[in-house]
């Protein structure tokens, strides 16, 4: 079944910034997709096209990207009469139309909007759920419910506090299914709120962009201490591990790292990559920290390689790899990390996202599917993580509807699968896939 109409519009994301939404029509109906956007972005990401007109949305408008869909992509795509199940053909056609290495002509936000909508239409065309269609595209017989990674304490570029490290997460890997993982996550979140309120006062429980708390603390181990207390109070010390997203590129200065980067600059306090690595090792020793994302700058390859060789935890590449097969290949060769953070808008199409995922998995890496800090109510990544069988997803705290939209969709998927539902749990790094 081919596409009859495509219409893009500008909508607002969860931070009040414009983003692209695409409606795609076939004889089966209308299929809608919205594109997310990040705050801490890697320099190697595909280009998100913004208007740059300061008189409108402070320069963040997406009218140009919307126009590219409506005026450049739509007619040419419809003319080709591709079947919507041919995801790869359609994505490659758009990439050829754009013709640039990083999608800078149309913008990754234009191409991805269409790509996501095509994927939803393809599932409807086959009469299967979206997660099943994605599993087929990836060549998987199985589908797997992921372990959620709830970002419950925010720092870095996501928060107005002095905390340098961007995310402190809880992963309920000891849960027996996804529903239980949600309950554990929510209960720890509520306990954490009470712990923070008791220690720092009521205004310390205001939430950040991703629904986590952003108490005004400076020391990163203080955040870990708060998590440890909340996990114990909730009664789940044996079921939860801690994950971190350091986003170290945000505080990399002159070859060193500034753990107080939100204060006036003082090079005397900068630390080396080795010192930062030792700090992480102390976290791993003192707390159940089992996953660290972006521990070093996106181009500090030596520090990555040294650290990954020295620890047995999950080391996740985000700014390092930006879901880009070329960067992933480089990281594989250098043994820089052992897990890919998969963000569809970093690479800009469904086909390339699947390719990046398969490349990582074929090299023995784990894969964690991720939201962005500027999200929408679109739930595509919930189906994506189930279909790609990656075993882990991070899409914020159990708070704020644009985050819960994904978690709730995962609960619906688990319910729909019934007795066939498999939960990654303790195998979150390497789920058993058929």
Swiss-Prot record:
In which pathway is this protein known to take part? Carbohydrate degradation; glycolysis; pyruvate from D-glyceraldehyde 3-phosphate: step 4/5
InterPro entries given in the database record: Enolase, Enolase-like_C_sf, Enolase-like_N, Enolase_C, Enolase_CS, Enolase_N
Pfam families under this entry? Enolase_C, Enolase_N
Cofactor field: Mg(2+)
Q: What is its EC number?
A: 4.2.1.11
Positions that bind Mg(2+): 245, 293, 318
Q: What does the cofactor section's free text say about binding?
A: Mg(2+) is required for catalysis and for stabilizing the dimer.
Gene Ontology molecular-function annotations: magnesium ion binding; phosphopyruvate hydratase activity
Q: Does the keyword Lyase apply?
A: yes
Binding residue positions for substrate: 158, 167, 293, 318, 370-373, 394
Cellular component GO terms, alphabetically? Answer: phosphopyruvate hydratase complex
- Work out whether the entry's keyword set contains rRNA-binding: no
Which UniProt keywords are listed?
Allergen, Cytoplasm, Glycolysis, Lyase, Magnesium, Metal-binding
Per its record, the protein catalyses: (2R)-2-phosphoglycerate = phosphoenolpyruvate + H2O
Active-site residues, record numbering mapped to chain: 210, 343
Biological-process GO terms, alphabetical: glycolytic process
Q: Where in the cell is it found?
A: Cytoplasm
Q: Which NCBIfam families match?
A: eno
User: How does the annotation summarize its subunit structure?
Assistant: Dimer.
Into which family does the record put it? Answer: Belongs to the enolase family.
Please give the HAMAP family that the UniProt record associates with this protein.
Enolase
Q: What does this protein do?
A: Glycolytic enzyme that catalyzes the conversion of 2-phosphoglycerate to phosphoenolpyruvate.
Name of the molecule in the record? Beta-enolase
Give the originating organism. Answer: Salmo salar
